[in-house]
């Protein structure tokens, strides 16, 4: 379980999917937007967003104030990828990104991510 603090209008991750884990976001403060599959939702404090394995998804702060949420990913193991991402010191190309996340059963769609950023006026 990881607590995320997202400034206003920040996208937490590119549109991605993982094949081994289910992901849950429990909203503590603020408003969080999420996309999973073809559906988009907006959730506030006390709401739980379920993002099942194998489905394209991402989430962002949909409000003008900071948001806080708990991310629960089960089963464990994906946290090693997060540690690697936290140690990055420069931006990755789409190809480098895919090479980094593929061993963890993950893939990302950067084109769809940038469309989402534009649609919602997000920072990524």
Question: Across the structure, where does each feature detected by a protein language model lie?
Answer:
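A short glycine-rich, His/Asp/Glu-containing loop-to-beta-strand
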Residues: 1-15, 21-22
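A cytosolic small-molecule/anion-sensing beta-strand core signal
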Residues: 2, 28-29, 45
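Tight coil/turn sites that cap or link beta-strands
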Residues: 7-10, 46, 54, 64
């Amino acid at each position: 379980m990881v607590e995320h603090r997202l400034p206003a209008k920040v996208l937490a991750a590119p549109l991605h999917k993982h094949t081994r884990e289910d992901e849950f976001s429990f909203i503590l403060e603020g408003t969080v937007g999420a996309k999973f599959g073809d559906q988009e939702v907006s959730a506030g404090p006390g709401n739980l967003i379920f993002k099942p394995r194998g489905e394209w998804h991402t989430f962002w702060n949909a409000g003008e104030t900071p948001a806080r949420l708990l991310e629960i990913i089960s089963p464990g193991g994906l946290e090693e990828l997060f540690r690697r991402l936290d140690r990055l010191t420069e931006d990755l190309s789409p190809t480098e990104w895919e090479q980094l996340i593929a061993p963890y059963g993950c893939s990302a769609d950067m084109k769809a991510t940038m469309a989402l950023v534009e649609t919602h006026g997000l920072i990524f």
